């Protein structure tokens, strides 16, 4: 296993920061529009339990679409593959993450995968519990175990900001309800989903969760199985095929690491058997991925031969 060097990581961060001027923050969500586009930080959590970081890793980042992979893991544990994949498919779309197009073209009208918004809404709908509060608490408890951090919660400001502006996601919910994919109150589902997306943590937390996936679901310190091997495998597969929105193919070729991004600028990556990586860089490219974060991962992948292909 390569020895990750802090001085080298700091240099890579400074190099990648030069690209921030070509990106822009997600200002269509007012609370995310306040982010500093020049911010960039990274944590690498290795299989032997060591952490190397660069940049301000104390800054908290909301998960946004990164939460989709965590909700999927919980729902797969709760309900099993057969039930989950009756409601949502397994295929990449090549469409933007918030597109409704394939829902209208494909029969039956179930979302093509859990990483696009329609599929993620169907997955969140399947989180067990009798109320929004109970379901959110179950998801938070699961995320806290993966991150080894009992303090993790969600940003009320970001959740409220997203709830007030989630017009397209509401449209997706009503479409899914019309076709029998979901059967709950749309506003309750939106309440849960926006709070799920607003769960916030540091790059170190992200990296530790990435390492759990990299270790096939095992806690890096205790060795306890936090999720079944098959669940970790399915999630990593989706990270490769759909994790970077409609740039997933290019990302697989250039970088080759299972990863999931969010429009907050966060990236969670899992290098099987080797390390987890957490990145925060809010300057986004036109696909909604962290522009500086992707540049940083590309440099890491090439320097340390991290591609799984």
From Swiss-Prot:
Its EC number is 3.5.1.2. SUPFAM superfamilies: beta-lactamase/transpeptidase-like (SSF56601). Keywords: Hydrolase. One of its GO terms (biological process) is glutamine catabolic process. The keyword Signal does not apply. Substrate binds at residues 65, 117, 162, 169, 193, 245, 263. It is an enzyme of class 3 (hydrolase). The keyword Transmembrane helix does not apply. GO terms for molecular function: glutaminase activity. It catalyses: L-glutamine + H2O = L-glutamate + NH4(+). PANTHER family: GLUTAMINASE. Belongs to the glutaminase family. NCBIfam families: Gln_ase. Homotetramer. This is Glutaminase. It comes from Geobacillus thermodenitrificans (strain NG80-2). The lineage of its organism: Bacteria, Bacillati, Bacillota, Bacilli, Bacillales.
């Amino acid at each position: 296993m390569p020895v990750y060097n802090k001085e080298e990581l700091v240099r890579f961060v400074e190099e990648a920061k030069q690209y921030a001027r070509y990106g822009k923050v997600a200002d269509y969500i007012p609370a995310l529009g306040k982010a500093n586009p020049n911010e960039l930080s990274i944590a690498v959590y290795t299989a032997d339990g060591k952490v190397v970081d660069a940049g301000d890793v104390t800054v908290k980042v909301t998960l946004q679409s990164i939460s989709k992979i965590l909700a999927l893991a919980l729902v797969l544990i709760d309900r099993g593959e057969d039930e989950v994949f009756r409601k949502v498919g397994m295929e990449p779309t090549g469409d933007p993450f918030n597109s409704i197009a394939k829902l209208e073209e494909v029969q039956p009208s179930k979302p093509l995968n859990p990483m696009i918004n329609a599929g993620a809404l169907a997955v969140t709908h399947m989180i067990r519990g009798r109320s929004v509060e109970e379901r959110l608490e179950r998801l938070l408890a699961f995320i806290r175990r993966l991150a080894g951090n009992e303090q993790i919660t969600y940003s009320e400001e970001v959740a409220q900001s997203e709830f007030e502006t989630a017009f397209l996601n509401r449209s997706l919910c009503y479409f899914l309800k019309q076709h029998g994919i979901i059967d709950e109150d749309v506003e309750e589902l939106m309440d849960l989903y926006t709070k799920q997306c607003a769960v916030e943590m540091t790059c170190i937390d992200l990296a530790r969760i990435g390492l759990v996936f990299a270790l096939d679901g095992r806690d890096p310190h205790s060795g306890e199985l936090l999720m079944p091997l098959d669940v970790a495998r399915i999630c990593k597969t989706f990270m490769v095929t759909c994790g970077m929105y409609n740039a997933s193919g290019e990302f697989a070729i250039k970088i080759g690491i299972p990863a999931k991004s969010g429009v907050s600028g966060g990236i969670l990556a899992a290098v099987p058997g080797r390390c987890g990586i957490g990145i925060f860089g809010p300057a986004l490219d036109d696909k909604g991925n962290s522009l500086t974060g992707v540049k940083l991962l590309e440099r890491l992948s090439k320097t340390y031969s991290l591609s799984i292909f």
